[in-house]
A protein has these predicted regions:
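Carbohydrate-active catalytic/glycan-binding domains of CAZyme proteins
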Residues: 3-178
Length: 178
């Protein structure tokens, strides 16, 4: 009996322009979504992640990814963890402007504020040089930049030896403080 040879993986075809079929995201097969975070709102789970789309160029060729040019976050949601809706990306350059270097590893929380509305706070690593935050009263935006700068930077008191804060993890305590 002769064993069949396993063919070598090939470069993506035009139909696989953004990702190889062996490199799929189970939630969204044509989009990378690293470092996911999620929040539940009105029976729907909203997931946000680092948008690694530039790992392949427009023709499907591999490119070098230094992560320094990631300036958008991916959004998707589900009601049943089976069927997913892709909501596009948050263009962080448009929201944050000139102070943004890159946006990685988001972390989201929501809470009802004094105005009676649920507010969403989406924190992100700004290229390892700090942690920024954008806000919205909807899990899908529009998003605004309330500070115009990093919330936490390497010079923030109390960081000790952590001169490059990144990959935030945000929680809200039972008393409502965060």
């Amino acid at each position: 009996r002769q064993e069949a040879e396993t063919p070598e993986p090939s470069e993506p075809t035009v139909m696989e322009a953004y990702k190889k079929t062996t490199e799929v995201n189970p939630l969204n097969p044509y989009r990378f979504c690293a470092d996911p975070t999620s929040v539940e709102y009105e029976g729907r789970l909203y997931v946000y992640g680092t948008n690694d789309q530039q790992e392949f160029d427009a023709t499907g060729g591999l490119t070098s990814n230094t992560y320094g040019k990631i300036r958008s976050l991916v959004m998707m949601s589900t009601e049943d963890l089976v069927n997913w809706t892709y909501h596009g990306t948050i263009d962080m350059t448009t929201v944050c402007g000139q102070w943004l270097n890159a946006s990685w590893a988001p972390s989201i929380v929501s809470r009802e504020e004094a105005d009676g509305k649920t507010h969403f706070y989406l924190y992100f690593s700004n290229s390892g040089g700090g942690v920024g935050v954008i806000t919205s009263t909807s899990p899908l935006g529009p998003w605004t930049d309330p500070l115009g700068k990093n919330l936490i930077s390497g010079s923030t008191p109390g960081l000790g030896l952590c001169s490059t804060p990144f990959d935030p993890g945000v929680v809200i305590d039972n008393d409502g403080s965060g």
